[in-house]
Amino acid sequence: MDLMRAILDGIAISAIFNGAVAVLALINPRYFDSYPKAIQKAAPEQMTEKEKKINLVLTILICGICLIYSAASLLHTGISGFWNFFWMGYFQWSILNLGDFFLLDCLLFQGKYKDRIVIPGTEGHPDYEFGNWMRHLAIMEHFVVTPFLIIPFVAVIQALIVEL
């Protein structure tokens, strides 16, 4: 396993993912359903079917690009074996997850551009406050669900693809 390569590839897919999500969230925050449920329910207008479809397409597109990049990079590492591919993928996607937490949840959603990514009609909702945001969304998402469920699943799929 090439740990340095895994770290660099993780930074690259993190930049792709977080850059795309940040730009799209700033364009229209309603395109993403990654807000705490209380904020989503407080919105005067719920996500329309069109917005849900856009969310699904963007999610598949952005994650697909990251998966293709990551798998292609693994093919060119010169390593072999399912477990080597799995752990390289796990490290890559873990770095993306940490980038998502620090860049999107901490800096974008809680930082300088906080007012630009508010769903219209939910201004001043208490779940936009840092502590509530972390408690109701970010901690569970980034330190429980993603590292123990989503990343292992994606790393297995990626390792199987690369092994073929």
Regions found by a protein language model. Name each.
Residues 2-20, 83-102:
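Alpha-helical transmembrane segments
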Residues 55-74, 139-152:
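Core segments of transmembrane alpha-helices
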Residues 103-124:
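Juxtamembrane non-transmembrane "cap" segments at the membrane-aqueous interface
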Residues 153-164:
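Juxtamembrane boundary at the C-terminal end of a transmembrane helix
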